[in-house]
């Protein structure tokens, strides 16, 4: 995907991208490639792949979830090089955005990126979700929590739901369909205060499969969750489901 295809494809999906926003995306791409020469931030190095697999892919929640186009608070868990949080912020600058990552080298990149793009109302946090979800400045404070991760769904539920206020949503961005994981999530959802809302299956323009799953926060998460760092990954609530 090249920049023209990026704009045309999104415009055809009723998500117009202004010239000013395209300048920000181009700056982002160039800075990511330059920074990656000294710090490995992404396995995706080709510009055409970054436009598709990072930028376009990050914006897919805006195509399927109308509430994501409004003013809202959003936390991106395990943001890495800024995906999906920074592309979402570029397009919807009404977001109050928090980017959380456990590696300082990624936070250093994100701090410089935010400054370079002159993005407002963006906070970076160096740490683990298991720790910061117990911090009252972050716990149940967000309208949305999002993750583009390969972790088991039950693990992600435990990491994300504690950040979201009752009435908010978490958004899981998956590369394959996860019926068995959702089917096996009932115990985790009950413990954590969530309820499956919607699931969208679609393909990127290159035919790669994607799934968006939204979970409504219907009650406060029990105080003991999330458990200590590493435990949600090793021993998900309700077990692992293939």
UniProtKB/Swiss-Prot annotation:
Specifically methylates the N7 position of a guanine in 16S rRNA. GO terms for cellular component: cytosol. InterPro entries: rRNA_ssu_MeTfrase_G, SAM-dependent_MTases_sf. The keyword Cytoplasm applies. Residues 221-242 are annotated as: Disordered. Its EC number is 2.1.1.-. Keywords: Cytoplasm, Methyltransferase, rRNA processing, S-adenosyl-L-methionine, Transferase. NCBIfam families: rsmG_gidB. GO terms for molecular function: rRNA (guanine-N7-)-methyltransferase activity. Gene3D superfamilies: Vaccinia Virus protein VP39. S-adenosyl-L-methionine binds at residues 78, 83, 129-130, 148. It comes from Oenococcus oeni (strain ATCC BAA-331 / PSU-1). It comes from the Bacteria. It is found in: Cytoplasm. Disulfide bonds: none annotated. Belongs to the methyltransferase superfamily. RNA methyltransferase RsmG family. This is Ribosomal RNA small subunit methyltransferase G.
